[in-house]
């Protein structure tokens, strides 16, 4: 293995960067909600859903593929082959993203009118198509720098990109868009696209400065397609179903007599609740980003013991971390949503989804480990099953049960996906955690929430929950002396 910073310190570095970026992103979401309202946020979410589908289709699995194939070459001590891997990835990306961009431009009016329901955003769809190849090529370069363990460089560029993007976007919103929701959508897409241009040029310049001597040309196409196509199918299916859901939800909610403003209710959950729910995930996204190439390198080098060790530690960390924020978000939900959005109803929805935090956070890590071990085809199967169920549940439940039906569908499908993913991981690594560990963790979370909820002051609730949860986890021996020694060792290690 290369003698570079351990994965723990790289994860800390990415965590710091991701936290800063998430603070900025959440603040921007608050700014937008105050400027264009819940209905405007709902329209923006629909536009971004279509854009997200196009981006996923244009990426066609290339970001993870570039990361995986680069890590594989480095794990086999063949750095001279990386140039040919990148060359193949770039050509693949240009073909896929170019094709999707053309389709977006040709069908922009139909997408805006029939899918989104607002013909005025057709220009926004075309604007997104213009920047699509840039975003996809940026994904290739980010995958390379992550696999090459150049985390510091990547973090610096990402911070600079975010500063550039936010500055441009806020300027466009303030001086041009005003409170016009369609112009606000265009401003967000324009700012993001120009930020992607900055990132791509920066990473290409830094790669060129490496002056690595390439080896003899190697065949890449078959390996690339074997990796990228299953990923593309899984990602496209997941994104496609997600887009269908987002476009369908307001229309099906309109049939429910309990929902006065379906677009506002949809915007409240997707544009207000989910950003808060997923804000603490910065550390796990950082870890997941590093686990894919790390597992690929270990698998290529035959380091099965290290794979098992990392899988056990990562899954345990995600479970405990999710448990911590499960209770905090549940107990502080009303205060957070009133402070951020001046919206008490969003607090009710945040309480519902906060209870799912341990499962959602663990699923992020599990998915990364499976991809790092080359199990892309399994991901396709799981996404087909759960996504199909999600659409069926939403179609049937929303007109009768409203947002309660939305939550039920979210719970069942995400739980099923998580169970299938964990089952696949355990087949590859063997037993990682005793079944008693998640059960005792859940018991500790429930008791800590119940006792802390008796307090009225929000700060007191939060502090009491942290202390109670930590004490109960130690009492139940979920956190052992071995864990404490491990943490101390990480802190002391140079």
What are these regions (language model features)?
Residues 60-75, 278-303, 311, 315:
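Helix-loop junctions and terminal segments of transmembrane helices
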Residues 452-494:
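Membrane-proximal transmembrane or re-entrant/amphipathic helices at the cytosolic face
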Residues 6-67, 94, 101, 105, ...:
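Signature of the first transmembrane helix
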Residues 32-53, 181, 185-186, 222-227, ...:
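Interfacial/gating helices of multi-pass transporter permease domains
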Residues 93, 97-240:
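Hydrophobic transmembrane helix module of multi-pass membrane transport proteins
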Residues 109-128, 329-360:
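Interfacial segments at transmembrane-helix termini and the short loops linking adjacent helices
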Residues 21, 29, 60-67, 127-146, ...:
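Short runs within selected transmembrane alpha-helices of multi-pass transporters and secretion channels
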Residues 1-24, 80, 84-87, 218-238, ...:
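N-terminal membrane topogenesis motif
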């Amino acid at each position: 293995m290369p003698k570079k910073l351990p994965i723990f310190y790289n994860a800390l570095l990415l965590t710091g960067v991701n936290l800063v970026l998430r603070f900025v992103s959440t603040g921007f979401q608050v700014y937008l909600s105050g400027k264009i309202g819940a209905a405007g946020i709902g329209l923006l979410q629909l536009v971004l859903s279509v854009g997200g589908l196009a981006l996923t289709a244009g990426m066609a699995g290339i970001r993870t593929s570039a990361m995986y194939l680069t890590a594989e070459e480095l794990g086999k001590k063949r750095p001279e082959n990386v140039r040919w891997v990148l060359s193949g990835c770039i050509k693949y990306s240009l073909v896929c993203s170019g094709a999707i961009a053309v389709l977006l431009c040709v069908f922009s009016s139909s997408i805006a009118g029939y899918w989104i329901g607002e013909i005025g955003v057709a220009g926004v769809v075309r604007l997104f198509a213009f920047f699509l190849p840039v975003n996809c090529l940026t994904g290739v370069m980010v995958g390379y720098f992550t696999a090459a363990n150049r985390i510091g460089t990547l973090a610096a560029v990402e911070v600079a990109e975010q500063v550039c993007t936010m500055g441009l976007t806020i300027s466009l919103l303030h001086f041009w868009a005003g409170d016009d929701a369609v112009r606000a959508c265009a401003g967000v897409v324009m700012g993001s696209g120009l930020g992607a241009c900055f990132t791509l040029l920066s990473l290409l310049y830094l790669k060129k400065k490496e002056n690595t001597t390439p080896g003899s040309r190697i065949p890449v196409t078959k390996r690339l397609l074997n990796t990228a196509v299953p990923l593309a199918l899984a990602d496209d299916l997941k994104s496609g179903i997600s887009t269908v859901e987002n476009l369908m939800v307001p229309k099906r909610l309109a049939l429910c007599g309990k929902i006065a403003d379906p677009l506002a209710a949809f915007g409240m959950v997707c544009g207000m609740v989910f950003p808060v729910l997923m804000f603490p995930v910065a550390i796990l996204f950082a870890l997941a980003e590093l686990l894919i190439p790390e597992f690929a390198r270990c698998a290529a080098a035959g380091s099965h013991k290290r794979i098992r060790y990392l899988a056990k530690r990562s899954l345990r960390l995600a479970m405990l971390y999710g448990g911590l924020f499960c209770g905090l978000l549940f107990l502080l939900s009303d205060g957070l949503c009133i402070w951020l959005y001046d919206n008490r109803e969003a607090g009710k929805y945040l309480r519902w989804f906060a209870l799912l935090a341990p499962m959602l956070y663990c699923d992020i890590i599990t998915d990364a480990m499976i991809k790092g071990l080359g199990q892309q085809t399994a991901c396709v199967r799981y996404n087909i099953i759960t996504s199909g169920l999600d659409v069926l549940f939403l179609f049937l439940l929303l007109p009768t049960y409203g947002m309660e039906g939305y939550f039920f569908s979210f719970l069942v499908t995400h739980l099923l996906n998580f169970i299938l993913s964990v089952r696949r991981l355990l087949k590859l690594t063997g037993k990682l955690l005793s079944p008693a560990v998640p059960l005792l963790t859940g018991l500790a979370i429930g008791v800590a929430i119940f006792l802390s909820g008796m307090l009225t002051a929000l700060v007191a609730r939060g502090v009491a929950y942290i202390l109670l949860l930590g004490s109960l986890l130690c009492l139940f021996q979920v956190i052992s002396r071995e864990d404490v020694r491990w943490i101390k060792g990480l802190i002391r290690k140079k």
